[in-house]
């Protein structure tokens, strides 16, 4: 049986461990004084492009500018006149002072700024909406194959916008199409408010 152990004896630190028998599955230590930005979405401005690093630095309001590597650039930023097998660099996709929406993937650590992405993901109760990544559709691999097939049909019936990806979370198992549709509509409204 899995157990969750919570240690909150120190006012500035919270420790949570998940165990099964004598095996530690997960350990999370949260410092209350630290500002957590992971998962947050910000409107930022490209402050510097570093082709040698294949990355850009983005001012999104934190103490240090965030680090945006080329692999985290959403397809919408790639040049439209792409030729077969043509390779791009970060300077082909972004310009200095360009405003972009970014999501924090990793919080600041030491002297390094936060790791950022433009491939946004919005998590709902049953679904995850990928508003600028149409190829990121799927169903949680934790579900059995029979349930996955049922959910696949339900997701297709949702008629999500073609440019957006939808992933069904494990919590979506056994949910009726109305609940999934409600979750999708909520996430679409959140995305609309962000943009």
PLM segments and residue spans:
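Single-stranded RNA-binding surfaces
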Residues: 1-195
